[in-house]
Amino acid sequence: ELTKWDDELLVAASPNNIVADTQWWRADWDLFLVGQCKKMGVEYSDLTDISDLREEDDGVLLWIKTERSQRRVKAGLLIDACGGRAGIGQLLSIRKKTLNSTPETFAVHGHFSGVATIPPSNSQLGTGPLPYHPEDSAIHHIIDGGWVWSLRFDHGQVSAGAVLREKNYRSIQDQSPESIWSSVVNKHDELKRLFQKAVPLYPLRKIKRVGFEMERTYGNRWIMLPSSAGFIDPLLSTGFPLTLQTIQRLAF
C-alpha cells in the first residue's frame, strides 16, 4: 500500500548500509589519503604556493614557495585538483566561460553544530515512520529560486549550504555569507526550526559563481580533473566517483 508523503520525496538508492553511498568528513578523509600517499613514497608539501608555471616539451616547470623555502620543480605531468579555484587556470590565464544553458547561481556553505534533527516520520501529515531515517541520506530542501543541502555526519555535525539563482536573490547577492544564509533560513519555517540553534564551526564561505567551464582543460604535460575543468551544480555532482574514474584513466 502506497502512502502519500505530501511534498516529500525519498529515494532509497542503496540496498543496505554496507554498500551505501558515504558522506565523507573531508578533514579526516583527506588526512587519510595524504597518509596513504606518503606511505607509497609520495613527497607531500603542505601550505605551498605555486608562483609561476612554464610549459616545456618534456614536462612542466614550477616555481613553488613554502613557509621555509622557495625552489624550482620539474614535473613530467601536472594534475590540477584545485576545483573551482582553478590553479593552472590562474597561472596560465585561462578564461572561465559562463554556462549559458544553465541558470547563473551563487552559493554559501559551511559546517555547523547544534542543528536540530529531522524526525523519522512525516511531520506534516503525522503519519507512520518513514522507510529509513531521512538523515541517513543527503537532505535537499527545494526553495523558490534555489535549494539547500544538509548532510549530517556520525558525530552530529552538519555540512549545509544553499545554491541560489542570481536573478531571484540579486538583492542579497553581495552581502556577507552569514547574512545571505540567515536571510534564506529565516524565510522557511522548516529551515528555521533546524538551524535556529546551530553554530558555524568556522566563518561561512561564498562561491560567487557556481557554474563554469574552462576554455582549456589540458596541455602537453598538464591536465585538469573534472572539478577544475568545469562544474554545473552540486545537485548534479557525482562527487568522488568521477574524480577517481579520471585518475584511473590517467594511470592506465
Predicted regions span which residues?
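Conserved aromatic-histidine-acidic binding/catalytic patches
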Residues: 21, 25, 138, 235-242
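Predominantly flavin-linked oxidoreductase catalytic cores and closely associated redox partners
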Residues: 25, 35-192, 247
